[in-house]
Regions:
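Compositionally biased, charge-rich terminal segments
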Residues: 17-21, 241-248
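Long, low-complexity intrinsically disordered regions
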Residues: 220-242
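Short acidic, low-complexity intrinsically disordered linear motifs used
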Residues: 246-264
Length: 264
């Protein structure tokens, strides 16, 4: 059984956190090289910056976005870190935001487990923790007909893509939110606030965004690999296995961590 303890919220300037990031970066250099960032990868990071700005214009964001905690398993404890894309705290209420840019609605499924872990850890500090995914839709099929056309195309995906509505129906933890005010009202479910690419362009300006995705779409589809169970940057034990680094167009937590820290 895995339990959590000793949570702390830190800024990215925390010395121990920076030391862990540097240690992880060195370890990564000894593994196979990561692929160069694709346009969609770059856009995902740019969309995150834009939506954090958008949030900051509407609510007061906390600068302490690094969550340090102890993960306890088999009578051993490991210090771990994860970055919160955005966080606001009002009294004893915390609201965590996860920003994802994806062309697959299945990205929501994969985010649920990580965000439930984050909520469990933060509840050791705050009794009520709301969680919201800000989903930037970069090409999720809009209808059953669109899915059928995609599967009948020259280069169909390896598995049928799900509709946004199908994922919301299949995953009870997810709740669609009409606006930001509605997103933070539930301390149990995970809110989903959806943005179009056009909305991100309106916030950031097209000249500041990587929007040339044609070359990305010409790349061969990569096989799926197991995903990390949580957004971990590093661990205090050399006995811990290193999670895999590659995934599809959704943000891989470890790779995203390095990009956000300016270390990749």
């Amino acid at each position: 059984m895995t339990t959590y303890g000793r949570p702390r919220l830190l800024t990215a300037a925390d010395k121990r956190y920076r030391a862990y990031i540097e240690q992880f970066t060195i370890a990564r250099k000894n593994q196979k090289a990561m692929r160069p960032p694709r346009q969609r990868d770059l856009f995902g990071g740019q969309a995150e910056v834009a939506l954090r700005q958008w949030l900051g214009e509407r609510i007061e964001l906390d600068e302490r976005r690094i969550l340090e905690y102890e993960e306890r398993r088999n009578r051993r404890g490991f210090i771990k870190y994860r970055e919160l894309d955005a966080l606001t705290i009002v009294g004893r209420h915390a609201h965590v935001f996860e920003i994802k840019a994806s062309r697959t609605a299945n990205a929501l499924r994969r985010a649920v487990g990580q965000l439930q872990e984050t909520r469990a850890i933060l509840r050791l500090l705050y009794p009520t923790v709301a969680v919201t995914i800000l989903l930037v839709d970069t090409g999720i099929p809009a209808s059953v007909e669109a899915v059928a056309a995609l599967m009948a195309g020259e280069r169909p995906p390896s598995r049928r893509p799900e509709l946004f509505s199908e994922v919301l129906t299949a995953v009870p933890a997810l709740r669609f939110a009409e606006d930001l005010a509605a997103a933070g009202t539930d301390g149990e479910a995970i809110g989903v606030l959806r943005f179009s690419v056009e909305a991100i362009i309106a916030i950031a300006g097209a000249e500041h965004l990587a929007l040339d995705w044609d070359a990305d779409d010409e790349e061969p589809e990569e096989p799926d690999e197991p995903r990390p169970t949580s957004s971990l940057y590093a661990t205090s034990s050399a006995d811990e296995p290193n999670p895999t680094a590659e995934d599809d167009d959704d943000d891989n937590p470890l790779a995203a961590a390095l990009r956000k820290a300016g270390l990749s």
